[in-house]
Amino acid sequence: MSRLNIIAATLLLGALNALSAEQAKPEPEAPGIVVKLWPQDAMPGRAVTGTERTLPARGDEVIRLTDISEPSFTVYRAESAKPSPAVIVSPGGGYGGLAYNKEGTEVAAWLNTLGVTGVVLKYRVPNNREGAFQDIQRAIRLVRQRAAEWHIDRARVGVMGFSAGGHLSARLSVHSGPATYPRIDAADDQPLRPDFAVLGYPAYLDEGLVPLVDGQTSPTFIAHAEDDKRFIKGSDAYFAALKDTKTPHAFFRCATGGHGHGLRSENDVKVWPAKCRDWLTQIGVLPSAR
């Protein structure tokens, strides 16, 4: 091989390596702690038949899970000298499945860079909204109960969800009254209301949640692109309700980004993580010096 060809091959290899690094999807550096939500034979509501499985790949590097018959969460702890905030992350998937890496573990990895513990929720799917709602209620109670064990600040436990997971997170943040399942153990003595909520292109908000927004609703950040024609109107209505009730809120509304991008967008919506970080700092979840 000539010297010119060697140089060309070296440059090509370098370019390919750089492209590979750029396209690599972030994942938490350390394996997480897996916690089942319910004791054996104590799960309330309707069970999901079948065994958890991964849906066929679609060529978009998204791991889609379904048939979640044993709901759980995985804790990805932040490295922090002081107790850290924690966020329960609910992936979307239309309540039919979970975009587990794109809207779950990749988000937990980003939260870790902010000094936040990410808790990725596997809630009951498919077609089990009430079971999923019971799952997120149980999850926030377990996180608060075991906060000292995981070095979490119990006063800074929030929720974050995408698409259907955004609906699930919003539903918890507007919920008043007791849990929708009977007390099982001491974890169920913990509060239900999140300290804050982050909703990424949330779905179904205009299907009954908007009238439930009141002065007790969790402080809420919404990120949504206008070209998500199916669901943007729900976010608009939810934002108006937050504003009317003087609930602390922020709405990053941009022109392009569509639906289902997670942290991967190259459109206008790609700056939403920075906007969210700034808002979390503003409301005191993150330290202002970060």
Question: What does each of the following model-derived ranges do?
Answer:
Residues 24-81:
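N-terminal cap/lid segment of alpha/beta-hydrolase-fold proteins
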Residues 83-92:
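Short beta-strand element of the alpha/beta-hydrolase
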Residues 91-96, 226:
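Active-site glycine-rich loops that stabilize anionic/oxyanionic intermediates
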Residues 99-101, 106, 120-153, 264-271:
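Catalytic nucleophile-loop/oxyanion-hole region of alpha/beta-hydrolase
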Residues 134-216:
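Primarily recognizes the serine-hydrolase "nucleophile elbow" in alpha/beta-hydrolase
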Residues 216, 222-224:
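Short beta-strand/loop motif that positions the catalytic acidic residue
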Residues 229-236:
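Conserved alpha/beta-hydrolase "acid-adjacent" motif
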Residues 239, 243-290:
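C-terminal catalytic histidine-bearing segment of alpha/beta-hydrolase fold enzymes
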